[in-house]
Amino acid sequence: PMSLHLFRKFDAATNKRDDRLIVRTTDNEYYETSVFTVGDTFRKIVNLAAAGKDCSACYRYNGKDLFLASSERGFFYTYDGTTLKKIENAPNMTSMCVHAERIFATVSGEQNKVWFSADFNPENWKVSGDGAGYIDFDDEGGKVIKVVKFLNYVYIFRDFGVERLTAFGAQTDFSVSKIYTASARIYPDTIVPLGDRIVFLTEEGLKCLDGYNVQNIFADLSDFLSSDKRNAVATGMDGKYFLAANMVFPGDFAVKFLDEVRDQGVYNTNG
């Protein structure tokens, strides 16, 4: 698959969870299957398609759980498990998160902006003083590469730094604080919220952010990583961080750890 997504959904009719695993295939179509139904098959989500890097989020709107999907050269969709809706005026997003009932997103072709939807309405992207809008980042931090919801803030990762956005209520009350300036490039596909920290890879190696401070972790790993880290990707599961990247010798690897001082291990997949 090209990507995997989790649609967190509650079925009011049965009073049970109805979470769906959604898979993007190599032909850029999407299929879903039930997480909790044993033996369930994959079903195509008709007319949901992507072009380029995709992203997703879950949002409860008008009493329904929605799966939100977008891609850098595609459209923005909402899906309630039955009905798919294309939102024509939304930007093409490369990452998104939900915070304080708004969607915050990085957008294809607008490398110095973070967009946000109207309050309590993920379908409204019309720019206005009390609706949707965007925040410009024009200093030396480089491109905006990913947004992450963490500890009641939106953390905005850039090529060479991290900003913390406080965003509750009206746009006029939004505020941005620079919390980290990097001397080495940050790789967007390695940024993973993991419990009480966000872990990410830079040209210098692995680092973690606790919301206020950044520190180096697993320093010995840097000796094994190739200087070309552009294709590095990571995910998190059960409190562990899994990273796939090129090494200094042929093959790929995955690394997992629970924190920076215990339960660490490197696993070479030779793939």
Task: Give the residues covered by each predicted segment.
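Beta-sheet-dominated scaffold domains
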Residues: D65-L66, E101, E140-G271
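N-terminal beta-propeller domains
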Residues: P1-F42, N92-R164, A245-T269
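WD40 beta-propeller blade core
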Residues: Y31, F76-Y77, E163, K207
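A broadly used, surface-exposed interaction patch
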Residues: F36-Y61
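Surface loop/turn motifs at the tips and blade-to-blade linkers of beta-strand repeat domains
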Residues: V46-A51, K86-A90, D136-E140, K178-S183, ...
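Short loop/turn segments that connect beta-strands within beta-propeller blades
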Residues: V35-V38, Y79-T82, F120, A167-A170, ...
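Hydrophobic core register within WD40 beta-propeller blades
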Residues: L4, S56-C58, M96, V147, ...
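Hydrophobic or amphipathic alpha-helical targeting/insertion segments
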Residues: A57-I87
